[in-house]
């Protein structure tokens, strides 16, 4: 039985299938192995992918991009606030949830981020079915390591709404290691691996320990000010300055003109990963004036030098944070399309002269291939080269319970610190006045910061209809079990009466 792996990134999506003992990326109907994560709306239809991206110049206010940045977030989230301020589509809050207000010309419609993601997942399913047939719907979906529970849930629900049977959510760094079979090549040895993911909008770094085939995240960091789009923008700004030099007009104040330059710069950026120069041609950039400019790889590297330095400094900072030196890293796995840039690869090689730089798999295909391998494992492919023991076995964030101290102030107790090896079980006793008939256990998540905000609450268990006591306290025993797949099972039991309630929260391993 075949299985599917899907990676939905901020700027692109990719699907791989596991069949006959191997995982391969599937090209879409345009022949591209990576699909732009862009959805364009009109009064008659929704268009996903390259056609939507190409039409954005004409329909910018009805074309949704970077939906992953807002998925599962609230207006109180700083990331959502930044997205809303930059979005060319109007984003509003309705009934406590974020919605896109899309003007198609004929009507105005409200569209949820989850529905946008559903359409992209549907495109991935259609692409996978082109080689597997319509019966194959088992999928593993990747998520960033720093995604919160609400974001993970929204991503999984969007995949389910597209008709996928979601077997598991898997963290992107773990999928990258699975793609290269790290841990299987030396199942009894111990090594440290840096996963370097330069995606469309951010740089995500993870240092992972591989020990006897088991993975553990030691340290991770994400920089939202370094991504592929920033490299593209550096080149687009240069093209704008060249146009101004030649034609005495600054087009940087025109959103339409800059979008044309960004599209041309993106194509050139991709070409410069393999060629020494690239031509940037824009038809009718300003008042009917065409623009033609040749850019060398050396020029591009000079323009992007500050960004290269930021990438390397981010790696150095993570090493210092983890207490490692460059010599402690045995392998570096490259992920994300912009990690193809030759100059960046050379800088990484220079930083880790003793480590192996793994880039034999196209960097923008590594993560979905790893997800497909994991899906193959889960559906029981007897010919798989993998083993269930190589899954990431740690919690991504601190999991806390909320209580009240003697002064009445909120008190948070960390039960599963970030990086806790899985599976794991914790017990927590909650004391409540005997005079009340219901008790609520609230679960929160955090990134290890000193305070926990209300929006980080992700689940609760309520014990109701308890017999009241005139005096004293009642003890409620909470047993929390986080399984290998990252799901969290919570059972609360009144110790006096035995009354209990239980929930299961699906999270990513």
Curated annotation (Swiss-Prot):
Disulfide bonds: none annotated. Keywords: ATP-binding, Chaperone, Cytoplasm, Nucleotide-binding. GO terms for biological process: chaperone cofactor-dependent protein refolding; protein refolding. PROSITE patterns: HSP70_3. GO terms for cellular component: cytoplasm; cytosol; nucleus; plasma membrane; ribosome. InterPro entries: ATPase_NBD, Heat_shock_70_CS, HSP70_peptide-bd_sf, Hsp_70_fam, HSPA14_NBD. Component of the ribosome-associated complex (RAC), a complex involved in folding or maintaining nascent polypeptides in a folding-competent state. In the RAC complex, binds to the nascent polypeptide chain, while DNAJC2 stimulates its ATPase activity. Belongs to the heat shock protein 70 family. This is Heat shock 70 kDa protein 14. It comes from Rattus norvegicus (Rat).
